[in-house]
Amino acid sequence: MIIDTTYLLPLARIDVDVDLLKASVEGRVNVRIEEMTVSLISLFELQAKAAKLGVASSIVHEALEVINKAFRVIPFYTKEIVEVSFSLRKTMPDYFDCVILATAIVLGENLVTEDSLIHTKRDLIEKEYRIKIYDFSSLLKKT
């Protein structure tokens, strides 16, 4: 499963309402960390967001090291990902999201994201590309 950058932000001590990694470690979601994959562009996006928020560079570097060790990180510059991301860019304004979604499409893996535009287009994406789009709440185990 490809995870969006949002879920990596807590590793750089950036608070989010949807801490997928913590929930996974605690067994509260239906996906294990070992099943999660990250686009390399998410590392850059995390770094940029952390810089904007004034997070110390040492914390960011540590987060990037953890991501590289804990996850399968997929390059964003493969021919297929570039082609699909350019195609998606015609209807999606955020190129980071295009690349992350393109990574899921090219690998044939499901995507978990909180992005409202992707969720608005979820039915079309799922039908056209035969992947599933989830958000954090949909991965929570039923109690």
Question: Where do the model's predicted regions map?
Answer:
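Alpha-helix capping/helix-boundary segments
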Residues: Y7-L8, S42, E80-I81, V99-I100, ...
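Acidic, PIN/NYN-like endoribonuclease modules and their adjacent C-terminal/linker elements
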Residues: A70, I74, I105-V106, N110-T143
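Acidic, metal-associated active-site segment
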Residues: D94-N110
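Acidic catalytic patch
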Residues: N68-K90
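Short, conserved catalytic or adaptor-binding loops enriched in Gly and charged residues
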Residues: E26-V31, L64-N68, L124-K127
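Short, well-structured N-terminal submotif of metal-dependent ribonuclease cores
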Residues: M1-V38, A50-E62, L140-K142
